Amino acid sequence: DIFAGWGFILRRPEISRIVLAKGMWATGGGAQIFLLIIIGMEADFGDISTGAAGIGVLYMARGFGSGFGPIVTRPLMTVTRYMPYIIGLSLGGAGLLYVGVSQAEWGVWTLVLVFFSHGCSGISWVFSTTLLQRRTDNDWMGRVAGTDNLIIVLTMGVSTIAAGYILEE
């Protein structure tokens, strides 16, 4: 059944593109865990000192952004033909905003950039999952969703391990 599900995904480009795009996002998603920790340890967020509190504030901005993006763009989900474009734009936006994080002075602006970057990530996550559900027959949905999650978790795990190894060297 698993191999039949993989075959189904590969034969349907409108499904495989979404599954592979989410997997590609995960290549940086795992390493990003360390990035937020490093920034949180060194950034100055005003009254909040660096260290554990700084890490917590960054992850708070990340979490709020991840919820904010899909809520704000929810009305756009009714237009299915726009969804692939919104997914692409939001993935690109998330990446560009992290380029901004790399260029900005680590402080309050970092929180704003992380918030909006993860707003974009949340949009791509919710829209791509919804689009997969709409495009996949019920008979195949479990295998498609399972493969989607397998690719994401495996890729994020490898990305996290690689980033940890790079930081140790």
Where are these regions (language model features)?
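Transmembrane helix irregularities
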Residues: I9-L10, T27, Q103, T136
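Aromatic side chains
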Residues: F8, Q32-F34, Y59, Y98
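Alpha-helical transmembrane segments of multi-pass integral membrane proteins
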Residues: I15-W25, P84-I87, W109
